Amino acid sequence: MIDLKRNTKGEYVEATGLNSQKWRIYQPNQKDDFKISRSRFGEFKDCPRCFYLRLVKGLQSPGMPQFKLNELTDTLLKKEFDECRKNQKPHRKLIEDGLEHIVPYDAGITKIINSKKEEKEWQIIDVWRESKNHGLKYKFKDTNIILQGGIDDVWLNKKTKELIVVDYKSQASPKEVSQDTYFDKSGYHGSYKTQLDFYAYLMKGMNLEYGISDDSYLYVVNGLDVEEGFNAEIKFSETLIHHKIE
C-alpha cells in the first residue's frame, strides 16, 4: 500500500516525485548544517544510490501508511517506564529478568523554545524522543553534517554507571520471540542492530554525565492469538532482546 499526495488541508495534490522542501535536499558545498536522520542513515547502508537520489537529487519515494497501533504501544510503554523513571525504580520486566540494578534514566529538565517562540520546560528524555525537531544530535567530525535520531528510552545501569540504549518494538507473530532467533540473518530484524548502534554512537558524542554501555536492548511486545477472542483487548508477550553495541 502507498498513500496519495495530500497537502496540509488533506486535499489531493499533484505528486511530482520530487521533494518540495528544499532544506531536506543537500547542496554540494553548502555552508548550512544538514541533518541526516537514523532512517536515512539506514537507507545509506542498505542502498547508497537510493540515499543519494533522495538527499541530493530530491527524489521522493512513495509514502507508506502509518502504523498507529504500533505507535500506541510505544506511547503506552513510555508512560509505564516514565512512572518508574519518576520513582527511580526498576520496571517489572527488568525485575523479572534479574536486572534490578537497571532503572529508567532521569536526565532532568531543560528549557525549549517552541514553534510559538515560547519557552517551555521539557523532560530531557522527551527532548531525546522527539525526532522531528530535537532528538539525539551529534555533529559528525569537522563537517556540517548533523546526525540525528529520536530514541525510545535510555536506562541507567546503577552498577557500572553507564547508560543503556533501548528501543521498543511491536509485532504480531505466531512465532515465539527468542534471543536465539530474533536476529536471524534472513529477516529484517538485523536493521534494528544498526538502529541501536546509531543511537549509541550519537550518545557517545554528546558528552553526557555517564558513559554509554556496550549493552543495548529491544523491548519486544508480541500480540498473541488467544482462544477466547478479542473482547476489546489484545494480549502481548514481552521479551527483552539483548544486543552488544558494535
Placement of each model-derived feature along the sequence:
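Hydrophobic/aromatic-lined pockets within catalytic cores
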Residues: K57, K86, S170-S173, Y201-L208
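Short catalytic/ligand-binding loop motif for oxyanion handling, primarily in non-cytosolic enzymes
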Residues: Y52-L53, Q60-P62, A172-V177, D225-E228
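A structural signal for short, well-ordered beta-strand segments and their strand-loop junctions
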Residues: E43, Y52, W155, I164-Y168, ...
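Conserved catalytic cores of phosphodiester-cleaving nucleases, focusing on short active-site segments
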Residues: C47, L147-F183, Y199
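Short histidine-centered catalytic/ligand-binding loop motif
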Residues: Q66-N70, E176-G190, I234-L240
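Metal-dependent nuclease catalytic regions and adjoining charged, substrate-binding loops involved
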Residues: I2-S20, Q27-N29, K35-I36, A200-E246
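Acidic, metal/cofactor-coordinating or nucleic-acid-engaging core segments within structured domains
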Residues: K185-E209
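Metal-dependent nuclease catalytic cores that hydrolyze phosphodiester bonds in DNA/RNA
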Residues: M1-E162
